[in-house]
Amino acid sequence: MRERQFVAELVSSQELPKMFKVRQTFPRPRIEPEDIPGIIRGYLSEEAFASKVRPGMRIAITAGSRGIANVALVTKTIADYVKSRGAEPFVVPAMGSHGGATAEGQKEVLESYGITESYLGCPILSSMEVKKIGVNEEGMDVFIDKYAAEADGIIVSCRIKPHTAFRGPYESGIMKMMAIGLGKQHGAEVCHEAGFKNMAKYVPMFGKAIIENAPVLFAVAVIENAFDETCKIAAVRAEDIVEKEPPLLKEAFTYMPRILVDSCDVLVVDQIGKNFSGDGMDPNITGTFCTPYASGGINAQRVCVLDLSPETHGNGIGLGYSSATTKRVFNQLDLASMYPNAITCTVLGGVRIPIVMESDKEAIQVCVRTCNEIDKKNPRIVRIPNSLHLEHIMLSEAYYIEVRNHPGITIESEPEYLPFDEDGNLW
């Protein structure tokens, strides 16, 4: 108790500035959910795609572990189309080592997104077994999901977006869904063993080998806007993936939300969680990259995490890239759910535990207190709810004059002190 009070006293004299609310404006192209089935059916009815799905074929459709907008609807629409062609669809989880690296765990991940056999009207065949389908250009064995390998055709359903740990022409998208998603635990380990330094090489190298040696028919890829909504759908034939995925990734970059001020002294993140990013908080937003092979996001000297989302179930991955957190976060951590993914991807930094303070106020205070070469009486603080929802954020008074004429920022309130309760918490 004495030590606790001593630590609190070290930061108690650090005053915190007034904050004001702003609304950030981003482009918002959007496809309404009710329009999605018609768009997908329209693409797949073209001869280039329809000719690949023939009566009697058993066709595997991939489904991943990310919370993609309208993912259940997209998957069902593809399955319904396959059935309309007289073929037999089934869904395979394509998520590397996620879901606890077990068949049942991966099926449960899909069910949490509404991807169930009853909704789809077709089986979900989940297995961690893989089958060798060939070798890549460097002579390395290539394995994919056993059920997919034995199918007559594979349709890759996925989202295309920037990755959080490496840069290249193929990041999170079709190639990665094949190389790591369909590769299961084996594929994830092989690619990650080489490190993120080589990921931009390994993902397309394994992906191309899968296109050449597995019955991949085509891909149905979605892109999301800054509001986590479907804004584009693309159908890509297997033989066109190499050429057409990179431009789609470039387009996905343009739709990413961001914090419209370039830098701050302290970034306060109300919640992190796997439902916001595979990294807990998306470093493309927060600048908290786990490797030197990707960059971007806001330039913050300190990052403060106040809470975990309920949906992350104690998985505090990403916490290790913050400077300080709260006892509230510490008490929720489920290390058993945090560590497996970190071990598989060979990057341990995200599951470290930063300095733990008793309250929200103390956590923010210690971040300001330990910044170097700043005006500690008027610090530049940015507060966001999470790394996914960035329309409404808060800025400290130091930004007030600066953003008044910013074309993408609308001031929504006057500066006020944060409403800490008697324990120093915001909720």
Language-model segments: which ranges?
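N-terminal amphipathic/basic leader segments beginning at the initiator methionine
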Residues: 1-38
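C-terminal non-catalytic interaction/assembly regions of soluble proteins
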Residues: 4, 283-288, 292-427
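Glycine-rich phosphate/diphosphate-binding loops that line cofactor/substrate pockets in enzymes
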Residues: 44-60, 83-84, 261
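Residues that mark the start of a beta-strand
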Residues: 58-60, 265, 302, 380
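Short glycine-rich or small-residue beta-strand-to-loop segments that form or flank ligand, phosphate
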Residues: 58-67, 90-97, 382
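Histidine-anchored nucleotide/phosphate-binding helix
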Residues: 69-89
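An acidic, phosphate/nucleotide-engaging active-site surface
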Residues: 105-169
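Conserved, well-structured core segments that form the ligand-binding/active-site neighborhood
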Residues: 143-273, 287, 296-298
